[in-house]
Amino acid sequence: MTRPLVITDCDEVLMHMVVPFAEWVDAEHGVIFRIEDASFANALKRKECGTPLEAAEVWPLLDGFFRKEMVRQYPIPGALAAMPTIGADADIGVLTNGGPEHQQGRIEQLALHDFHAPVIGSRGGKGEPVRRLMEQYQPSVAVFIDDLAGHHQSVAEAAPDVWRLHLVGEPAIADKIAPSPYAHARIDDWKAAQHWILARLAENIPAPAREPV
């Protein structure tokens, strides 16, 4: 019998990202990151004049952070502590939008916190990567965890049998992000999230069909 599968994002689910990123761009690049939501659109502004950075300027900053500054990140409370208990009942994979080029860095980052799991660095919507993981693992039941609503929609469309948990572990942005209508639950506390995940694994049934949104 195949084991259940838990597919989790990393940034703002397992590890804090926007706060250490904001501190870094402020100190090293003279840029203020106004944390209003999980989007980077118009969030980065030059300290000296307040003008927003263009998209072409934002992505090199993100790339630089993930290449050299991931050591600044620190775990979301309760997240990594929950992994051994969840891992006793399910395989765990980390699916991050950091891109393939940052995949090894993410593996090493998590290993420093004694969490060892397969990591997939993807781009764009996570629906297709989740669908491929479902084909690869053939799990008895699967749970997907992410902080971004768009990824829940993508997974709902590409892999509707997967349970979807919307979790925003960063308090600075959690109350600014509305619950995704494509997720089965919104829980931002890992103690409660662990109970919800373990309950889905114990039930061992596919996610129900989604009501029209």
Can you say where each PLM-predicted feature lies in the sequence?
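Active-site neighborhood of HAD-like aspartate-dependent phosphohydrolases
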Residues: 1-58
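Glycine-rich phosphate-binding loop signature in dinucleotide/nucleotide-binding domains
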Residues: 2, 88-90, 135-141
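Short, basic/glycine-rich phosphate-binding loops at helix/coil junctions
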Residues: 50-66, 106-114
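Short, acidic loop-to-helix structural element flanking the phosphoryl-transfer center
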Residues: 64-94, 101-107
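Short, charged, surface-exposed secondary-structure boundary motifs
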Residues: 127-131, 173-182, 196-198
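Acidic, Mg2+-coordinating phosphoryl-transfer loop and its flanking beta/alpha structural elements
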Residues: 144-188
